[in-house]
Every structure is written in structure tokens, then in C-alpha cells.
């Protein structure tokens, strides 16, 4: 109730706000957009391609409560590839284990911060893979086609995410 006194606008959950921002950027700039919101338990990926908005939630990839899922699904080698120091695998696993048993702690050393950044990169990578798998055109729909469409190999159910449209 106190928060409502601070604003004249309705308060909306973070995913709704981020989704609105992504849609507005795509609309105002007439571009394709990808955005992410990584939290403690989930990672949300938002995209607009060809004016079509999609949001996916990777419920098992976050930076605190589900950090063990990030490690399990990405593997220690994928996490290690982002680290530029000489942490041995045992030390790395111990530091990640500490984060698993104390998920809300904040990194206290530069090495701990780099490890969390490496895990964040992997959470984003895994979540984006899922997003591309779920952000697809409708399957099984009948499309009106011309004879020239016969030579176009696109099928229903393919991903809507086109990285070449992002102009990175």
C-alpha cells in the first residue's frame, strides 16, 4: 500500500515491465530486439522479430536458488571457458558449492565475481537456446501459398528468432 502512494501508475511485475519495454523499443525503432532478465531462480528472454513478441521463462536457470541447475546443464567446462584465471577445477567447484548452499550471498572477491559472471553467461546461453526452441511459428496451420512458395523450404513450427536481423 505504501508503494502505491508513490506513483499514479499501476505497479506491474518485472516481467510485464521488461516485456513492455522490449515491445516499445521494437515498435519505436522499427527493429528486431532481444532482451533478458536474469533473476535468482529464473531467466526470462524477450524478443520481437517481424513485429511478433515472444517471452519465455527458463524456470531452472537463475543466479541464486537455481545456480546448481546452470552448472549441471552447462557443465564445468562451459563455465570454465569464461574464466581467464588459473582456478583449478576443485577450487571452482568448491566456490560454486558455497553459492549453492548460500544462494543469496554477494561475491566478496574478484574471483567469486568472475565465477558468477561465468555462470550468468551460461544461464543466458542455455535460456536463449530454450527461447529459440519455444519462439516458433504456429504448427499445423494451413497457409495460403502460391506456386512460387513451392520452392520456399520454410515450414510451420520453425523458430522466429533470426539473429541476422539484430544488426549486432
Regions found by a protein language model. Name each.
Residues 148-153:
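Eukaryote-specific, cytoplasm-facing alpha-helical/coiled-coil scaffolding segments in long proteins
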Residues 11, 54-129:
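Glycine-rich phosphate-binding loop plus the immediately following alpha-helix
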Residues 1-32, 112-125, 131, 135, ...:
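Nucleotide/phosphate-binding catalytic cleft detector across ATP-hydrolyzing
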Amino acid at each position: 500500500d505504501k508503494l502505491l502512494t508513490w506513483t499514479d501508475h499501476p505497479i506491474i511485475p518485472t516481467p510485464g515491465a521488461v516485456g513492455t519495454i522490449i515491445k516499445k523499443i521494437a515498435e519505436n525503432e522499427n527493429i528486431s530486439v532481444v532482451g533478458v532478465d536474469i533473476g535468482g531462480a529464473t531467466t526470462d528472454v524477450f524478443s520481437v522479430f517481424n513485429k511478433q513478441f515472444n517471452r519465455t521463462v527458463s524456470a531452472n536457470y537463475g543466479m541464486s536458488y537455481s545456480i546448481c541447475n546452470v552448472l549441471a546443464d552447462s557443465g564445468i567446462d562451459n563455465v570454465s571457458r569464461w574464466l581467464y584465471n588459473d582456478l583449478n577445477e576443485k577450487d571452482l567447484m568448491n566456490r560454486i558449492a558455497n553459492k549453492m548452499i548460500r544462494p543469496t550471498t554477494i561475491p566478496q572477491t574478484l574471483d567469486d565475481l568472475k565465477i558468477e559472471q561465468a555462470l550468468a553467461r551460461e544461464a543466458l546461453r542455455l535460456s536463449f537456446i530454450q527461447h529459440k526452441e519455444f519462439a516458433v511459428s504456429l504448427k499445423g496451420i494451413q497457409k495460403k501459398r502460391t506456386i512460387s512458395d513451392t520452392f520456399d523450404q520454410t515450414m510451420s513450427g520453425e523458430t522466429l528468432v533470426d539473429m541476422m536481423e539484430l544488426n549486432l
